[in-house]
């Protein structure tokens, strides 16, 4: 695209990917709120894993419950990694489904047409 003097570059927004483990949920939530208030965050991806690399459902529930509404209040979409059922349960905005996870069709069947 050629730039003209009337060209307005779209603003850059941030995509935050959470660390694979969060030990201090309250401390992390406070830190995340600082980040959300400091910059324009488009979305954040919650991707908590176990030692074997599987999704840590218990930790995802705990952290997701602590941060989802707060992030959404700042205008950030919340994506849950690899788990459409947890995305629905937590009221997330979407789910990240990797190539080696379920198909998009399977994920859509779980989250429904409105997510």
Functional labels for PLM-detected ranges:
Residues 1-96, 110-115:
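Conserved N-terminal beta1-alpha1 strand-loop-helix module at the mouth
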Residues 99-105:
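Flexible, gly/pro- and Lys/Arg-enriched active-site loops
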């Amino acid at each position: 695209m050629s730039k003209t003097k009337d060209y307005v570059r779209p603003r850059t927004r941030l995509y935050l990917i959470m660390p694979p483990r969060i030990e201090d949920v309250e401390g992390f939530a406070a830190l995340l709120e600082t980040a959300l208030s400091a910059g324009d965050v488009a979305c954040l991806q919650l991707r908590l894993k176990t030692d074997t690399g599987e999704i840590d459902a218990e930790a995802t529930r705990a952290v997701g419950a602590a941060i989802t509404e707060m992030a959404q209040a700042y205008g950030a979409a919340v994506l849950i990694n690899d788990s459409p059922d947890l995305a629905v349960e937590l009221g997330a905005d979407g789910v990240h489904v990797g190539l080696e996870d379920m198909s998009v069709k399977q994920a859509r069947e779980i989250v429904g047409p409105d997510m």
